[in-house]
Amino acid sequence: SEFTNXKSIL
């Protein structure tokens, strides 16, 4: 998972 622009990318 990555966090980009304060959103969690799963």
Curated annotation (Swiss-Prot):
Superkingdom, taxonomy of origin: Eukaryota
Name of the molecule in the record: Unknown protein 19 from 2D-PAGE
Taxonomic lineage of the native organism: Eukaryota, Metazoa, Ecdysozoa, Arthropoda, Hexapoda
